[in-house]
Structure formats: C-alpha cells, structure tokens
Amino acid sequence: NLLQFGFMIRCANKRRRPVWPYEESGC
C-alpha cells in the first residue's frame, strides 16, 4: 500500500539503505 511504500522510502533515505516498514516502523 502507498502509505507503507512512503514509509519505506523515508526510512531508506534516512538509513541510506533499504529499510522495510515492517522491520523498522519507527525509523
């Protein structure tokens, strides 16, 4: 879903690597 995808992008940008919302929902 788009909301989860948005979280994924935000987390990935923060960590500079792929981070999935179900692994790091808090970023």
Curated annotation (Swiss-Prot):
<dbReference type="GO" id="GO:0006644">
    <property type="term" value="P:phospholipid metabolic process"/>
</dbReference>
<keyword id="KW-0479">Metal-binding</keyword>
<keyword id="KW-0528">Neurotoxin</keyword>
<comment type="similarity">
    <text>Belongs to the phospholipase A2 family. Group I subfamily.</text>
</comment>
<dbReference type="InterPro" id="IPR036444">
    <property type="entry name" value="PLipase_A2_dom_sf"/>
</dbReference>
<keyword id="KW-0964">Secreted</keyword>
<dbReference type="GO" id="GO:0046872">
    <property type="term" value="F:metal ion binding"/>
</dbReference>
<keyword id="KW-1015">Disulfide bond</keyword>
<keyword id="KW-0378">Hydrolase</keyword>
<keyword id="KW-0800">Toxin</keyword>
<keyword id="KW-0106">Calcium</keyword>
<dbReference type="GO" id="GO:0004623">
    <property type="term" value="F:phospholipase A2 activity"/>
</dbReference>
<comment type="subunit">
    <text>Heterotrimer of alpha, beta and gamma chains, each related to PLA2.</text>
</comment>
<protein>
    <recommendedName>
        <fullName>Phospholipase A2 P-elapitoxin-Aa1a alpha chain</fullName>
        <ecNumber>3.1.1.4</ecNumber>
    </recommendedName>
</protein>
<dbReference type="GO" id="GO:0050482">
    <property type="term" value="P:arachidonate secretion"/>
</dbReference>
<dbReference type="GO" id="GO:0016042">
    <property type="term" value="P:lipid catabolic process"/>
</dbReference>
<comment type="function">
    <text>Heterotrimer: presynaptic neurotoxin. Inhibits nerve-evoked twitch contractions but not responses to cholinergic agonists acetylcholine and carbachol and to depolarizing agonist KCl. Causes a fade in tetanic contractions. Displays a triphasic mode of action with depression, enhancement and blockade of neurotransmission. Does not display myotoxic activity such as changes in baseline muscle tension or inhibition of directly stimulated muscle twitches. All subunits are necessary for maximum toxicity.</text>
</comment>
<keyword id="KW-0638">Presynaptic neurotoxin</keyword>
<comment type="function">
    <text>Monomer: Snake venom phospholipase A2 (PLA2) alpha chain that has enzymatic activity. PLA2 catalyzes the calcium-dependent hydrolysis of the 2-acyl groups in 3-sn-phosphoglycerides.</text>
</comment>
<keyword id="KW-0443">Lipid metabolism</keyword>
<dbReference type="GO" id="GO:0090729">
    <property type="term" value="F:toxin activity"/>
</dbReference>
<dbReference type="GO" id="GO:0005576">
    <property type="term" value="C:extracellular region"/>
</dbReference>
<keyword id="KW-0442">Lipid degradation</keyword>
